[in-house]
Amino acid sequence: MLYPTEFDVIVVGGGHAGTEAALASARMGAKTLLLTHNIETLGQMSCNPSIGGIGKGHLVKEVDALGGAMAAATDEGGIQFRILNSSKGPAVRATRAQADRVLYKQAIRRRLENQPNLWLFQQAVDDLMVEGDRVVGAVTQVGVRFRARAVVLTAGTFLDGKIHVGLNHYTGGRAGDPAAVSLSSRLKELNLPQGRLKTGTPPRIDGRTIDFSKLDEQPGDLDPIPVFSFLGRAEQHPQQLPCWVTHTNERTHDIIRSGLDRSPMYTGVIEGVGPRYCPSIEDKIHRFASKDSHQIFLEPEGLTTNEFYPNGISTSLPFDVQLALVHSMRGLEQAHILRPGYAIEYDYFDPRALKSSLETKAIGGLFFAGQINGTTGYEEAAAQGLLAGINAGRYAQEKDAWCPRRDQAYLGVLVDDLVTRGISEPYRMFTSRAEYRLSLREDNADMRLTEIGRELGVVDDVRWDAFNRKRDAVSRETERLRTTWVTPKTLPADEATALLGKPIDHEYSLAELLRRPGVSYDGVCGLRGGECGPSEPLAEDELLLAQIKEQIEIGIKYQGYIERQAGEIERNGANENTRLPDGIDYTEVRGLSFEVSQKLNQFRPETIGQASRISGMTPAAISLLMVHLKKRGLGRRKGADSVPGADVQADNTAAQQ
């Protein structure tokens, strides 16, 4: 039957990508339907019970800055919070949280059920409705047909998923859930380029059988307790729990080696490529044969369960080998395994067949987000889902697509890497992937993106008001520090010595003093008995005050580096954002080699910047393209039209600093 209501956007899948996509399009005012095979698993953490980390935490902050749910849900469900790289520079500091699976899932579902313009429906999707070269809806397992102007597909590991434990395997999207076999077959009929990837998960352990007296405790940060959302509060956190650390040993490694003849990875049963940066334990032992030990983190799954996640022993070895290797580790000698570890193979589709909006180039209105694009990780999925949801909503509203640039967001880096370079293994975000990471920090994600989010319609009044209070306070106080001066006469020598190590010998602005190594904002404001501080509090709320101080300190201390990077961005941006016409035939560009023109015609880059990052492209080829565009008057700057955020970065340069 044809469902009587027509939607603007249909989102298929209720994982981290699907939930962010559905919430984003609904926030924009698009009538949105979220189709999931099981409403009870909305927002489920299928693998590790953690959010964030190096590069990943940056994505979560960006999702939050654009009004997304992941950071806020983590604040409500997080049972341990830490700042990684806290002793290093601000560009690489990252938030990571352990989450209670149940509380996190509840927080996501609560947001879905209370979001205006969003409908939920429990049914697996078996088919897409395609008319000509555009998608017009989806068909469920029992034949219900839903029509929509745009469809976002976020199928995770469910597309023709196959689960492996030793040499045994069976069809499944994850343990306990069916695979999407019919939908996978339908997508293959559409001739979208695809391949196979694999990922894995470790056995889960009953905490009542762990000897914690033999393990090293790893507590979270307590002073201050981190929060993930820019609107979050430490008071929102439930009870906090420690993690625990053990190690593999030579006996563990011998057990693993003895089982490799029954490993699906090493017997050719698994054909999909696994994640380089989250390898299975058997892969670690093989690749790092000289190491006699690997660190294993025992992470609590939640407050109402005894289950522990042993981070570091993802495996598809037979269960008897899993049992032996677990028992070989200190503190786990008597451990009971609650669930076996397994590997899962699944279909993905070459992201080079996508536009930077995450819309497929072949089928109008069809968007892909998450692991279907070859990425790995909750955070990468959520960020893509948010972007796909925004652009699906804009597509339905007949507005131009939006995607942040590489110099605007880690989300921009992620998408650009996917659509220009493709993937040969599951893609994971790192800070090292971003050329402009000093400007793309966790702490300024809101300064970079919230104004754009407001223009897009995904940022509500509460977030917008809080952002403006923060931005205005940072701007006012930074200006005060730059224009308030002290002299050897007005700053007592003993105070200067206590703060700077010696008296000052000429006039300094407070900003110049703050720029000194080891000098803090509070230290500067405390000079002259506090007279160097602001006349009124910057904020009443302690968390907001801490955020404001952090922005001020980083902006002033790193001003020179940030300005240098801004200049580099401006110089490189001249050609980076020049658009390539949709219908250009690259065989007609004089001077291009056959190989280069063939690649350009195959991947259809949207900008000169994207073209330059395609494998095999040369500076000479880019020059020929620029000449071709100039002669024909074809090129225009990306963002020169009505796309939101085209001018936001220039307007917010001071705020970002």
From Swiss-Prot:
Q: Which Pfam families match?
A: GIDA (PF01134), GIDA_C_1st (PF21680), SAM_GIDA_C (PF13932)
**One GO term (biological process):** tRNA methylation
Q: Which GO terms describe its cellular component?
A: cytosol
Q: Where's it found, cell-wise?
A: Cytoplasm
UniProt KW keywords:
Cytoplasm, FAD, Flavoprotein, NAD, tRNA processing
The UniProt annotation places NAD(+) binding at 274-288
The residues the record assigns to binding FAD are: G13, G14, G15, H16, A17, G18
Query: Which intervals of the chain are annotated as region Disordered?
Result: 636-657
Q: Which cofactor does it need?
A: FAD
Matching InterPro entries: FAD/NAD-bd_sf, GIDA_C_N, MnmG, MnmG-rel, MnmG-rel_CS, MnmG_C, MnmG_C_subdom, MnmG_C_subdom_sf
The domain of life for this entry's organism is Bacteria
A single GO molecular-function term is: flavin adenine dinucleotide binding
The subunit field of the Swiss-Prot or TrEMBL record says:
Homodimer. Heterotetramer of two MnmE and two MnmG subunits.
Q: Spell out the family assignment given in the record's similarity comment.
A: Belongs to the MnmG family.
Return the PANTHER family for the record: GLUCOSE INHIBITED DIVISION PROTEIN A, PROTEIN MTO1 HOMOLOG, MITOCHONDRIAL
Q: What is the role of the protein in this entry?
A: NAD-binding protein involved in the addition of a carboxymethylaminomethyl (cmnm) group at the wobble position (U34) of certain tRNAs, forming tRNA-cmnm(5)s(2)U34.
Quote the protein name from its UniProt record.
Answer: tRNA uridine 5-carboxymethylaminomethyl modification enzyme MnmG
Q: Which gene encodes it?
A: mnmG
